[in-house]
């Protein structure tokens, strides 16, 4: 029997998603399409009459703005928000800013596939000569991090390893205490939570790609285990496309 509800949403499409560039910790803005996705997701939450007691997001504006949109549309802008770097997207290191074609030309298609599809192989690190090194590594929002906490690149395994402690120490106790939680974050940090909730294998989580801007609802028991599969919120067509996209993730392209 479900005793708790958790809502998660991957941010709407960013300007760099639109350009097919590795974004990671670069603070890209939502694209026009992404802003519309956030509004559509917010409307779905409003229509479902879902209320929140506390919200969590990353320190990147594409996730924060998606959260703002949801709280605005649902008239819950007063609800407390916790921002943390631990919910940031995976750090794509030296690939940051490159599009797929440029990356394949520079490193070879086979190597790029390993970086994208492998659970525990990180991309090359972002060195001090990288165009975005200073704007990311020296940004004051990360001033409080210990040197060993500030990544220069991450695999999906690394991303999950820094997101899960925050889930275990901060979010899970709030849910168990009866708080209604919303998490607005990124594809890879949310994957880590989904993997943990559902006990998915490393391979299975690599094949799951959460759709942008569509709220995901979990009904959880007292041990925070799902009592039914994840559910998407939205109109029938939006939900159908989202489910098809997720179902197709593991198939050969």
Curated annotation (Swiss-Prot):
Catalytic center residues: 11 (tele-phosphohistidine intermediate), 89 (proton donor/acceptor)
Signal peptide: none
Isomerase as UniProt keyword: yes
Key words of the record: Glycolysis, Hydrolase, Isomerase, Phosphoprotein
GO MF annotations, alphabetized: bisphosphoglycerate mutase activity; hydrolase activity; identical protein binding; phosphoglycerate mutase activity
GO cellular component: cytosol
UniProt-listed PROSITE patterns: PG_MUTASE
Residues that bear Phosphoserine: 14-15, 118, 135
EC class: isomerase
Primary role: Interconversion of 3- and 2-phosphoglycerate with 2,3-bisphosphoglycerate as the primer of the reaction. Can also catalyze the reaction of EC 5.4.2.4 (synthase), but with a reduced activity.
Assigned protein family: Belongs to the phosphoglycerate mutase family. BPG-dependent PGAM subfamily.
Subunit structure: Homodimer. Interacts with ENO1.
Protein name: Phosphoglycerate mutase 2
């Amino acid at each position: 029997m479900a005793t708790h509800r958790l809502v998660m949403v991957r941010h709407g499409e960013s300007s760099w998603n639109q350009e097919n560039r590795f974004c990671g910790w670069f603070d890209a803005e939502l694209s026009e399409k992404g802003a519309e996705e956030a509004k559509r997701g917010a409307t779905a939450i409003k229509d479902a009459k879902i209320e929140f007691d506390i919200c969590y997001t990353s320190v990147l504006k594409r996730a924060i703005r998606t959260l703002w949109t949801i709280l605005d549309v649902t008239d819950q802008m007063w609800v407390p928000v916790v921002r943390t770097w631990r919910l940031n997207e995976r750090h794509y290191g030296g690939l940051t800013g490159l599009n797929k074609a440029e990356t394949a030309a520079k490193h070879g298609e086979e190597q790029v596939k390993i970086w994208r599809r492998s659970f525990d192989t990180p991309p090359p690190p972002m060195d001090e000569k990288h165009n975005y090194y200073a704007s990311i590594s020296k940004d004051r929002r990360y001033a409080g991090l210990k040197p060993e906490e500030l990544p220069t690149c991450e695999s999906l395994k690394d991303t999950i390893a820094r997101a899960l402690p925050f889930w275990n120490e901060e979010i899970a106790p709030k849910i168990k205490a009866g708080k209604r939680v919303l998490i607005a974050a990124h594809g890879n940090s949310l994957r880590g939570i989904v993997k943990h909730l559902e006990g998915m294998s490393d391979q299975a989580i690599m094949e799951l790609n959460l759709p942008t801007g569509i709220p995901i609802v979990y009904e959880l028991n007292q041990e925070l285990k799902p009592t039914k599969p994840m559910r998407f919120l939205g109109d029938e067509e939006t939900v159908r496309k989202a489910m098809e996209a997720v179902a197709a993730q593991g198939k050969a392209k």
